Amino acid sequence: MFGNEMDDTRDPLQYGYQRVNTGEGSLSTSTTGTSLDTIVLDTNAEDLNSTPRVGAQRTFSPILETDDTNPFLDPPPPGQKSPPAVGEAKAKSKSSLKGSRVSFDQEDRFDETDEGFRKQREHFQKHKSHSTSEHKNQLIKELRHLLAADNRRQFQGKKHVSLDVQSSKVLEELLKASSSEDDFEGQRKQFQERKHKSLDARHISFKFEKEPTPSSSEEDFEPSTSLLKIDADITKPVIIDLKVNRAQSDQALTQFQKNLAHFQDLESSEDEDYISSRKHFQQAKSMSTDSRKSNKSIRFFEMEMGTKEENIRTAVPFVRQITEDGKPKLEVYRPTTNPIFIWTQVLAALSVSLGSMVVGFSSAYTSPALVSMKDRNITSFEVTDQSGSWVGGIMPLAGLAGGILGGPLIEYLGRKNTILATATPFIISWLLIACATHVAMVLVGRALSGFSVGVASLSLPVYLGETVQPEVRGTLGLLPTAFGNIGILLCFVAGKYMDWSGLAFLGAALPIPFLLLMFLIPETPRWYVSRGRDDRARKALQWLRGKKADVDPELKGIIKSHQDAERHASQSAMLDLMKKANLKPLLISLGLMFFQQLSGINAVIFYTVQIFQDAGSTIDENLCTIIVGVVNFIATFIATMLIDRLGRKMLLYISDVAMIITLMTLGGFFYVKNSGQDVSQVGWLPLAAFVIYVLGFSLGFGPIPWLMMGEILPGKIRGSAASVATAFNWSCTFIVTKTFADIINAIGTHGTFWMFGSICVIGLAFVIFYVPETQGKSLEDIERKMMGRVRRMSSVANIKPLSFNM
C-alpha cells in the first residue's frame, strides 16, 4: 500500500495521483499515506477546491482488495524524463488494480515540468482532505459520538438478547444455541464478535484500497502512527485504533446532540451501506422497535437475580421453543411477581409446617398438663415431683435419639418420606398418653412423641431449604417456626379448658391433616439428584417452580453442586464432618443451637405456669401463659416479614439484646421478691418481661438457628451434619429442662435468670464474629462461600410467564 521514498522531482505524468471512488464521493490518496480523514468525505471528484462535507457517511461497505503481486515501479533519477515508460507503467498499474474501485484522473491536468509538478503538489497539499491535526481530532470526535456514545449506550440499556425479530432463521439458530447456559455463553461470544461495530469505538477497522502509485516525500505524507496500525501484508485492512477513555467520552457527549442531529439529516433509507449496517445491527440488538416486526408470538426467558429486584446486567436470558398443537410457538418469559405467589411452593411449605405445629404442641404440653396431672381428683395415678420432671424431660431426651437417627433416615428414605413417617408415631404417642392408667404409659408416650419431634425438627428445615427459592427462603423457611408457635398457643389455650387427657386426644388429631397434605407434595430435587434420578428431580422442580417455568438452569446448578461434593467426599461420613471446609459450618450451627437453648427458652415454656405462681402475680397464671403464647405466635410472623428485608444477623442482634435485657430484669425482680420486699406494686413486671423476652426470642434465636442449619450445612453432609446439630440441640434442651428446678434450688430464681442472661451476652459476641449472612443466597452460593471459594452469585428464579405479540 505504501511506495518507496522519492525525490521531489518525480514526473507527475508517469507517477500521477489517483482518485479513489468510495461510492459516496471521491477521495484523493497517495501511496505514501492515505489521509485518514477522507473516509468521511463527500466531495466533488472533479473539483479539488470544493468544500468537503464531514460526517457524511457513518458506515462503510467493504472495499475490494487486489492481489499483492503488483510490483511497485522504481522512480527514475531526479530530472530524468521517461515518456516511453508512461504507457507501460499505466498498463501495469491498471492490470494490478483490476477489480478495485480506483479511477485515474486525466493525465493532461498535470504539467510535465518539475516546476509544474511542484505547483500541482502544493495545490494538492493545500486542498487535500482534512490532513491537519484539527481535522483528525474532529474525526475522532465524530466516531466517538456517533459510534461509542449513541449505539453503545442504547445497546447497554437494552442488554444482550440477541434475537432477530426480522429473520426467523436467525431466531431459530439462537434457540438451538441457547439450550443450555454453556451453549449460550458460546453463542453470546459469537454475538459479541458479530454485533454492530459501533458498539466499541476502541476496535473499529476500515479497509483502504491498494494503490501502487508512489508519491513524493514520505515525510510530507507520514501516516499518523497514533491512529494507524499497518500490517506488513498490505492486503490486510488498516486498523484505526481509537484510544477512548472515560474522560474523553464524557467530554464528547457535550457535542453529541449537535452531531446526532447532523447525522440524522444525512441518514437515508436509500443508502445501501446504511441499510446493510442497520439490518446487521437489528439482528444483534435487543428487542428492535423496527416497524418490520414479526407476527410471531415471542417469549423471552429472563432470570431474576438477588432478592429485591431484577439484576439485568448479570441475568442470563434463556429461550426455548414450545410446541403447541404440533406447531412451534415462540414465547417470551418475563419476570413478573414475587416467588411467594407460586402456590405450589407455598403449599409445600404449609404442608411441612403443619408437622411443626404438632412439634410445638408436644413441646408445650407439660406446662398446662402437669398441673392437672398432679391433681388426684382428676388423675387415677400418682405423679410425684420427680416423675413430673421426667414427663417434661424425657421428650427432649428422646428427641436427642430422634435427631441422631434422623440424619441417616433423610438420606436413605428421603426428606419427604422421613417427615411423612413421623405422623404415625405422633398419633400413637398421644393415644398412649390419653389412655394412660399409669405414669409409665405417659412416659412411653412422651418418649415416642419426643423421638418424632427429633426427627421432624431435623427434616423440616432441610426439606424447606432444598425446595424454596432463595428470594423467599427466609419468609417461607420460618413458617415451621410460626406454626410451631401456633401449636404452643393452641396447647396453652386448650389447657385452660381441658385436663391432661383431653389435651392428649387433641394432640392425636393434629397429625391427620399434616399426614394428608404430605402426600400432595414432591420429594426434594436435590435428594433425587443425589440418587441419580435426574428425571424425577426435573419433575419435582417443575412442580415447585410452576408449570411454565424453565428449570434447566437451576437443575444444572444442583447437579454440578452434587458432582463437586462427590469429588471431594470420602468414604466415611464422620471423616467428611471433620474436614475443615465442613467443620466450620457445622460448628456455627452447633453454636447457634447452644445459645438458643441456653437462653432458657424451653425452661420458661415448660414451667411457665409455675414461674408465674412463684412470682405472685395478681394476673391469673393460665391467662399469662396464653398471653405469652399469643406474643410468641405474633412475633414469629413478624419475623417472617422482616427476615428477607433485614437479614438473619440483624434479627439475631435484636433478639439477643431483647433477651439480655428481659432476663436481667426478671432476675432483678425475683431477687427483690426473695429478699422479702413488697413487689405487689410491680406485679405486672414478670408478665411484661416475659412478653418482651418471648417476643425477642421468636424474632431471632427461635427460628433462625433451624433455618440456617438447612442453609449453611454442605449438601454432601447435610443429613449427617443436621443429625449432629439436632441431637446437640435436644441434648441442650434436655439438660436445661431437667436441671432447671435443681438450678433454681441451688442459686435461686434470680440467679438462674442472670445466668441465662450472661450466656446471651456471649451469644451476641458469637453472632457478631462468626455467623455469616445468608440472605438471598442460593444453597450452592452459601456452600462455596463457607468453603472459602468466592464466586459470582447465581440465582435462578423461574417466574410465571407473560406472553405478548411482537
UniProtKB/Swiss-Prot annotation:
Its main location: membrane. GO terms for cellular component: plasma membrane. Keywords: Cell membrane, Glycoprotein, Membrane, Sugar transport, Transmembrane, Transmembrane helix, Transport. It comes from the Eukaryota. It is a multi-pass membrane protein. Glycans are attached at N377. InterPro entries: MFS_dom, MFS_ERD6/Tret1-like, MFS_sugar_transport-like, MFS_trans_sf, MFS_Trehalose_Transporter, Sugar/inositol_transpt, Sugar_transporter_CS. Residues 1-339, 411-424, 469-473, 523-585, 644-649, 703-723, 772-806 are cytoplasmic. Residues 25-34 have a biased composition (Low complexity). High-capacity facilitative transporter for trehalose. Does not transport maltose, sucrose or lactose. Mediates the bidirectional transfer of trehalose. Responsible for the transport of trehalose synthesized in the fat body and the incorporation of trehalose into other tissues that require a carbon source, thereby regulating trehalose levels in the hemolymph. This is Facilitated trehalose transporter Tret1. It comes from Aedes aegypti. The lineage of its organism: Eukaryota, Metazoa, Ecdysozoa, Arthropoda, Hexapoda. The gene is Tret1.
